[in-house]
Amino acid sequence: LYENIIGDKMNTANIFNIQKFSVHDGPGIRTTVFFKGCPLKCLWCHNPESQNINTQILYDRDKCVLCGTCEKICHKKAIKIENNKLTTDESCDCCGQCVIYCIQGARQIAGKVYTVDDVMKEVLKDRVFYEKSSGGVTLSGGEPLIHIDFVEELLKKLKDNNIHTAVDTCGAVSFENLKRAAKYTDVFLYDIKLMDDEKHVEFIGMSNKLILENIRKLSEIHNNINLRMPIIEGVNGDEEHIIKTIEFIEGLNISKVNLLPYHDIAKHKYKKLGKVYEDDRMSKPSDEKMQKFKEMFENKGYKAKIGG
């Protein structure tokens, strides 16, 4: 597991986006802070740039005109254009100069080291919108709780400023991290992707045992857990998965269930990262199936919604 492995000081973390006016990451209008680094490797991940904890450069070949500017300004000589093809070798230190000088916008940086005060300065700009809409700030990723020292300090400062807090977590961290965050978190957005452990390893890269154990423990100390479930044909788009999930969460403090239909709108990000998007086994479930799954939760007394 990742644990506090970014930055020399406890109040720094690598963040790849601070998204304003989010309306799918908790109640009201929110600012979502996206942290880099995740212990999971979901095949459908819609933020693949979040998986690696380090800063990365994304390259869009379709926008690149091979002008050579990036090659000339790279102080590491990491960028080469040969035979009408641009490559970047491992000596790249992600300084971002190539991003700044690329007039075509073909290069993009994912990841910037922030202090807690840097983040507070950004999120406080939209305080009036939180107050008017009963919104707040959501910490997401990646997995924010691998940066627990930073996250705990940030959450505390948000609560000191009377700002509603949400933490979107995959649960694959030590329970101590969840416990530390829980003191200052109004709602947890907790992801459960697969109940079948073998499938969990196949599609996500690790066992689900820690994730399931942690939500049980979290339910004992926190009374506002929003369960979030991606629904993907070919992975978990079957009634058996829904039945097993309902059986598992019985007795837990689940305040709401969000069923998130699969999409592949992030496919282009994989290409920019030099990765292959393995979508041959995955597809979007029908509207009828999503409605049926929603009703299965509602029939057991849960408040359920399709989408975020």
Locate predicted features.
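Short glycine-enriched, charge-decorated loop/helix-capping segments at active-site entrances
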Residues: R61, V201-S207, G274-M282
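N-terminal pre-triad scaffold of radical SAM enzymes
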Residues: I15-T69, K85-C94
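N-terminal-biased segments
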Residues: G26-P27, F34, N52, Q56-R61, ...
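Conserved AdoMet/S-adenosylmethionine-binding subsite of the radical SAM
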Residues: D117-K271
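Short gly/ser/thr-rich secondary-structure transition/capping motifs
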Residues: N14-F16, E82, D168-A172
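Iron-sulfur cluster-binding cysteine motifs and their immediate structural context
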Residues: L43-S50, T69-T87, Q97-K112
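Auxiliary Fe-S-binding modules of radical SAM enzymes
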Residues: I5-P27, I231-G308
